[in-house]
Amino acid sequence: MKAYAAPFEKFVNLADARLGTKIISVTDDWFADANRLFQPTPAVWKEGVFDDNGKWMDGWESRRKRFEGYDSAVIRLGVPGSIKGVDIDTSFFTGNYPPSASLEACFLASGEPDETTQWVEVLSAVELQGNSHHYHEINNDQAFSHLRFNIYPDGGVARLRVYGVPFRDWSSVGDNEQVDLAAALNGGRALACSDEHFGRMSNILNPGRGVNMGDGWETARRRTPGNDWVIVALGHPGEIEKIIVDTLHFKGNYPDTCSIQGAFVKGGTDSQIETQSLFWRELLPAQKLEMHAEHTFAEQIKALGPITHIRLNVFPDGGVSRLRVLGKVSK
């Protein structure tokens, strides 16, 4: 099982470019485009690479400030949500990182922030070091749609990860509307898995199809009896009608078969839910998988009524690019 630097890293990265996160405005990104903050891949160093403005850096970098003030970037999150923690990553910024940074947030049902917007400080100014990750827990259950990332007074940051729980207004979903209850954009969250040696479990809930093997969940080769698995909390309770298991890009390393269990869980911690999952009812019996293919199951699904969590079992190991769990919302 992967070791996380902070417990909140298991939550969805609301500031992931793959979810649609982007810069709305920025005071200065002369040296490096601020939208690089949201790339899902770790920052890289390119030795000897320069562009018209100077050394190419994988992140956001502003000019050296020669007057009072500080730099800031206004960000629209790909999906609104409550924030559990952040990682301000200054990888490869050594003599050019900001000494400190802070984070503000707001929620707008539509439109973009303006001069009348009321911002809430979710992370007061914290000290930064060069070439380092800075993990900070945030306890705020309010949903936010936009962030204002402030760096004092200037400099460069490689990545900004904002981990939290996506928010969706489920009252707007029709009674007969079929939605992907496991999608990250709908609040689905990967809680735990047996192993994620080659790819994070949360990748399987991202929108679209995977761009490569690294954009999926892949386990190490199993050398002991048993099988690998991942547990997903659905964004909303629902009755499941269709399941899609996508092995795109996985050719010599896809699972032989898969099955899915489901349950309606009331309360409990992630670790307690992990233990309970052994005894959940069968939602989808074992199904043969093929390499590099989308597998759709409907008639094979058992009627369990409303469920809140599923457990995808893969036999014996391997990689899955995406998992879709479609059904009707239980109200």
From Swiss-Prot:
GO BP terms in the entry: allantoin catabolic process; purine nucleobase metabolic process
EC number: 3.5.3.4
Pathway: Nitrogen metabolism; (S)-allantoin degradation; (S)-ureidoglycolate from allantoate (aminidohydrolase route): step 1/1
Cited Pfam families: Allantoicase
This protein's record includes keyword Hydrolase: yes
Swiss-Prot/TrEMBL keywords: Hydrolase, Purine metabolism
InterPro entries with a match to the protein in the record: Allantoicase, Allantoicase_dom, Galactose-bd-like_sf
Enzyme class per UniProt: hydrolase
UniProt GO molecular function: allantoicase activity
Catalyzed chemical reaction(s): allantoate + H2O = (S)-ureidoglycolate + urea
Protein family according to the UniProt entry: Belongs to the allantoicase family.
Name of the molecule in the record: Probable allantoicase
Source organism of this protein record: Pseudomonas fluorescens (strain SBW25)
Gene label: alc
